[in-house]
Every structure is written in structure tokens, then in C-alpha cells.
Amino acid sequence: MNKILETLLEEKKIKLKGSLYHLTQINFSYNSNHIEGSRLTEEQTQYIYETNSFIGDKEKVISIDDINETINHFKCFDYILENIYILDENLIKTLHKILKNNTSDSQQEWFKVGDYKLKANFIGNSKTISPSNVSKEMKKLLDEYNSKAKITFDDIVDFYYRFEAIHPFQDGNGRVGRLIMFKECLRNDVVPFIIDEEHKLFYYRGLKNYKEDKAYLIETCLSAQDKYIKLLNDLEIFK
């Protein structure tokens, strides 16, 4: 077990405030949901995490889904820490099920919580893999990825891009994919990273232009990794 995973699991167990686990939970949930349009602030996310309650802003309406998906993301993060084994469809679908539990999406008959999409969808103006082909394409992606003798940082980012291109779920693909990247970094002894507000536009551009220039998305993720390394150093994780 690598030092980062060991630290996260230990701090989770003892519920240590101000720790790597504590800060990662808040930072990861806030940023990953914010990218997808959540209106919660980082301070509100922290308050929800620390108190399991919510204080709203009179000037801004907050969706119940934003609150539930924030809480669900905390649970998703715990799930990946407790399931650092080879990546498979069951784990990916379970992350989606946890993330979308008790949301308005989960009340829709056509929205498959914890299963692949039934309706075609787009990323921007680009059509994704059709629902009838998702299962086949996901199996192919996982088989190719898991067959690698050694999985590198670049392999993890490449998997994420291909996962996003398939867009297997009706919604929640970005958050599930970023959770997968964090998990796979831990599993393969790579320092993980969180895509935050500072990196968001570069991240979008990297995804859009990945086929022509893989380096842009990889460099963006490496920059995000540098921020997590700084946090590790500030907390003296490797001392």
C-alpha cells in the first residue's frame, strides 16, 4: 500500500480534522461538482462535510441536487479508498449509483442510476457512443487498459479521455471519471490530483483537442498534480 493511500485510510478511520483526508474530501467534492454547475461554495461544501447540515445564502437559490450530490461525492471518495482493486464495470457503475442516489435524476424512469445510458447524448456539439454500443466499448476500453504491464500517469489520463468520449452514463460522467483517475493513481503508486477552478478551462481545452495534442490535457493534469504534491509536502506526509 502506498503512503498516500495509507494516510488517507488511517485519517478516514480516526476522522482527523485538518488532515489530508479531510481537505481532500472537501476540495475534491467542491471542485468536481462545481465544474458540473453546482452553485455551492467551497465554504458551504466544507460546512456540509463537517456538520452534515446546510446554511443557505438568502441571495442565491441552491438546488437540493447540489447538496445531495455533494454528500454523495463524499461517499464516492470513501468507496474508492476502500476498493483499490483492478478497475472493472461493477466498480464504475457503483460509483455512478452512489453519486446519483436520491437526486431528481434518480426519479426519472429513463435515467439509469448505476447503469449505462438509454438515450443518446452529446459532449458540447460532439455525439458520443450510442447507447446500444456502450457496453461493448466499455469492455474494450477496460480490457485494453487492464492488460498493460505497468499503468502510468499518461495511461490514466488517456483512459479518462476515452471514458469521456464514450460517455457511458446519462449524466455524471465527468465526476465518475475524475474519481476513477484519483483511484487509479492511488492503485498504481502515482500521486493523484484534483481538477480545480484554476485548471478548469485548460482541462476543457485539453479534452477538446486531445486527439490532435495529447500533451495539453496531460500537462494540465500534471499541473494539478503539482498542487496536490504541495499539499502533501505542507502536511509532511512523506517526512
PLM features: residue spans?
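FIC/Doc superfamily catalytic core
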Residues: 1-171, 175-239
